[in-house]
Every structure is written in C-alpha cells, then in structure tokens.
Amino acid sequence: MQGGAAKKGVEIHGQYEAIEWVEPAAPKDERERAIIESDWQEAFIQKGGMTCWRERSYELFSGNTWETGQFDRVVFSGSGDARQAVIYDFKTNAKREGESVVAFENRLRKTYEGQMAMYVASLAKLTGIPQNRIEAKLLASATMSVIPVRTSTED
C-alpha cells in the first residue's frame, strides 16, 4: 500500500475495530446506519450467544515456522462440538474505473484467498475449531459488500 491508501486503511480499521456490535434499533452514527443497511450487518449484528474478537493479534509455531498475524474480526457462534467461526477481513481496495462489482469482488477473492486460507488454518490451531467449520469473508468498504472466500480447506 502507498501512503494515502495505507492511511485510509488504518483509519477504516480503527473505525470498525471500535464497534463490537450494532444495535439495529438504535444505531449510534452514520457508520452504524450504513452497516445496518448493507450486507455487513451479518458481521456486526449479534444473534444468540455470538461472541467476537476485534483486531486480535496472534502468534503460533506451525511446523518449523513462527507465524504472526492479526484477525480483523472473528465472530463465533455455537458451543462445544457445534462451535463455528467466521473470519471477516476489512478491505479498503478501490474499485477500478469501469470495473463491475462482480469483477471487483472476484479480484479481491483472488488477491486475498491465500491470506484467508492462512487465517482459517491459524484460527483452527488457536481455537480447536475444525477448519470445515470456519468461514472466511472479506468486508469490502468500497461497496459495503461481504465477499465469501473459498479456502483450500473447504470441500
């Protein structure tokens, strides 16, 4: 990322990191209203016993490699053997001139599928949740869309 884009990314991460859950009946500001009116609500409206991690750093030793990373947002649901998780990663990439939403989403999927596969594997090691019960999704700020990412661990 270059200067301006990096600064924008840090600002956006900071804004969304501050939000644990959005109350649909009482949004606190325009940002929360935008979440409620978009697909992002799946990541920010708490249902049942959901819990979340926000900007959670981790370190682990995997094979012969020391791995460090940071999850933007992980939402957990269920318990025991039914526990599952969704990893959400904020992306501030801009749509290119003339690029359709579908092309933009496909570009982001392709660009970040390796990163998201690493996050899925890491979360499984850290939590004991099997990889087949962990989903990976991108939250694209340019379109306020949720972009599912297939990882190599999925069937």
Description of each model-found segment:
Residues 1-80, 112-121, 125, 137-147:
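Nuclease catalytic cores
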Residues 55, 88-89:
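Residue-level detector of conserved, well-ordered beta-strand and adjacent loop positions
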Residues 90-94, 140, 153:
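A short beta-strand motif that forms part of the nucleic acid-binding face
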Residues 90-108:
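Short beta-strand-loop-alpha-helix junction that forms the active-site gateway
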Residues 145-155:
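Short, low-complexity, polybasic intrinsically disordered segments
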